[in-house]
Amino acid sequence: MGKEADVEAGGVRDYEDPPPAPLVDIDELGRWSLYRAVIAEFVATLLFLYVTVATVIGYKHQTDASASGDDAACGGVGVLGIAWAFGGMIFILVYCTAGISGGHINPAVTFGLFLARKVSLVRAILYIVAQCLGAVCGVALVKGFQSSFYDRYGGGANELAAGYSKGTGLAAEIIGTFVLVYTVFSATDPKRNARDSHVPVLAPLPIGFAVFMVHLATIPVTGTGINPARSLGAAVVYNNSKAWSDQWIFWVGPFIGAAIAALYHQIVLRASARGYGSFRSNA
């Protein structure tokens, strides 16, 4: 391989890209570190869904005129508060679990990192299973603690809003997930970490903020999925026909968005420098 164009003045890079993860690493199944990471993903996704869905249910109850009277219109945390709940929980949970599992908490993030060879197929599958189970358990806790409100206020399920086509909903999920996964790649880039020593500590902040911003943009359209586990967990517990009929949007969209983000970061942003370096070395 040729030298990269992003070398420092002395010709030596001040960062090192980690080697790609093996596609299938059977030996990984014998390591406790894998199962510890899977447990961390399960618990983190459970907590994420519990807090966020409880926030959604609470907001809808506080703004219900039949329950809160004339003050309902001014009650609750509002869409801004819901977006903060999602973004804030991602910030907290990524910070807590990044050193154990990488802090994915989202099958779309796991899928994007798998395409970029950051995690093996075995780890990716186990993570996604753990995330989905954690999401179901988290929403089930909300229903258990707020059974009188849960079904009445929609169970926190993602559904395409009235007036929007399925294509619009799909596009919203693709773009929203692209923003999130692109932020994940940028915040965890080893090149960035080498330049700014504080970046590893602050990495959860832009990731959480990306989730917050995407929610502001897409809550009116789809309720904001950008996380298939979040959408599946709510659909399983709520078990409503509308939530199930729209469920494919919240899997296809995020996986497409994650794939585009992975390809953009790995091929356009990072590999272009290597290609330019190879061209120069062969000139």
Curated annotation (Swiss-Prot):
Record has Metal-binding as a keyword: no
Entry similarity comment: Belongs to the MIP/aquaporin (TC 1.A.8) family. PIP (TC 1.A.8.11) subfamily.
InterPro entries hit by this protein: Aquaporin-like, Aquaporin_transptr, MIP, MIP_CS
Localization terms from the record: Cell membrane
Protein name as catalogued: Aquaporin PIP2-5
Disulfide bonds: none
Induction profile: Circadian-regulation. Expression is higher during the light phase than during the dark phase. Down-regulated by chilling.
Swiss-Prot/TrEMBL domain comment: Aquaporins contain two tandem repeats each containing three membrane-spanning domains and a pore-forming loop with the signature motif Asn-Pro-Ala (NPA).
Function comment: Water channel required to facilitate the transport of water across cell membrane. May play a role in root water uptake.
Motif residue range(s): NPA 2: 227-229
Motif NPA 1 per record, residues: 106-108
Record PANTHER family: AQUAPORIN OR AQUAGLYCEROPORIN RELATED
Domain of life: Eukaryota
Example of a GO MF term: water channel activity
GO cellular component, one term: plasma membrane
Transmembrane parts of this sequence: 37-57, 74-94, 125-145, 167-187, 199-219, 249-269
Tissue expr: Expressed in roots.
Swiss-Prot/TrEMBL keywords: Cell membrane, Membrane, Repeat, Transmembrane, Transmembrane helix, Transport
A Pfam short name: MIP
Membrane topology: Multi-pass membrane protein
